[in-house]
């Protein structure tokens, strides 16, 4: 078992705790970091190769339907020797990956660990009610790229962390509605200093800078050398059957000779075939 983490992921791990929101952009590795947190909480050790967990809790991952159906989380689970398939799961605990639409199915689960991916617990609908019931009886963390646009978006997470008894308690302490509006519209928030402190207690931001690695490969190909030389010598455009009038037109004809040669297309197809073979091999290994 090899579990490797980047520095920004290890830094986030040091700040994470039950009930936190792990905030990071696309490509920051939120999923890997969340599973590493679970691994550590269940007795694992990132500094000791092959260090097993000790009687890990059942883990439930609530994510988008797309991520569930494309098995993205299955790939993330593999380095931790976890799988939704019982015969592939080293620890034999229950591993469930499901979508937010089915959150209510798990509202009676207790003494387990939940990862809520792509946070959807805003407002006060069915998802939020199920989330609050789950949060009372289980360990949990949230993953999000955009944790909240307004203070009201944080109400469910604040309640789940025990900062407020319920939505009414939050509103009584912090919300002033616009009395001129025909529908409930927030005019302003009170005591925002406390709200900022509470948000900072649960928000773990991943300081991540994406670095693109360029890969260059030189592939020698042939071209029609006699035609290239004829154009150079005679200054004649063979495609339009007329004299070449300018230096830029001469360069364009040279490029056309080189770029339109069949050998270039063959080379591109060969590169694509090799890349596809490597991709299929990687997918096959992931399925084993």
Regions found by a protein language model. Name each.
Residues 1-20:
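Conserved pre-motif I regulatory segment
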Residues 110-130:
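SF2 helicase catalytic motif II
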Residues 261-276:
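Conserved interdomain hinge at the start of the Helicase C-terminal
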Residues 19-35:
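Walker A/P-loop
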Residues 56-58, 113, 130-212:
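Conserved P-loop NTPase motor "coupling/switch" region that bridges the ATPase
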Residues 277-284:
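Conserved small/polar residues in nucleotide/adenosyl-binding loops
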Residues 31-52:
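Walker A/P-loop NTP-binding motif
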Residues 56-77:
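Conserved Walker A/P-loop ATP-binding site and its immediately adjacent core
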């Amino acid at each position: 078992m090899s579990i490797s983490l980047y520095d920004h992921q290890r830094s986030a791990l040091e700040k994470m705790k039950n009930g936190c929101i792990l905030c990071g952009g696309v490509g920051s590795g939120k999923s890997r970091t969340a599973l590493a947190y679970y691994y550590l909480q269940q007795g694992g050790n990132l500094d000791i190769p092959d260090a097993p967990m000790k009687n890990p809790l059942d883990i439930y991952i609530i994510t988008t339907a797309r991520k569930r159906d494309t098995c993205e989380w299955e790939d993330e689970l593999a380095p931790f020797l976890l799988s939704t398939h019982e015969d592939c799961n080293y620890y034999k605990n229950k591993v469930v990956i499901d979508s937010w639409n089915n959150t209510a199915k798990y509202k009676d689960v207790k003494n387990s660990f939940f990862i809520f991916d792509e946070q959807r617990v805003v407002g006060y609908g069915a998802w939020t009610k199920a989330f609050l019931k789950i949060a009372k009886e289980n360990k949990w963390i949230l993953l999000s790229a955009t944790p909240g646009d307004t203070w009201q978006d944080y109400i469910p997470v604040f309640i789940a962390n025990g900062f407020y008894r319920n939505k009414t308690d939050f509103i009584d302490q912090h919300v002033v509605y616009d009395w001129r509006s025909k529908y409930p519209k927030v005019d302003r928030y009170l005591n925002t200093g406390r709200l900022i402190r509470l948000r900072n207690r649960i928000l773990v931001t991943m300081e991540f800078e994406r670095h693109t690695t360029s890969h260059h490969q030189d592939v020698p190909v042939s071209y029609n050398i006699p035609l290239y030389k004829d154009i150079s010598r005679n200054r004649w455009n063979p495609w339009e059957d007329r004299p070449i009038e300018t230096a830029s037109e001469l360069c364009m004809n040279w490029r056309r000779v080189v770029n339109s040669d069949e050998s270039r297309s063959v080379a591109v197809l060969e590169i694509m075939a090799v890349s596809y073979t490597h991709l299929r091999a990687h997918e096959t290994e992931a399925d084993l």
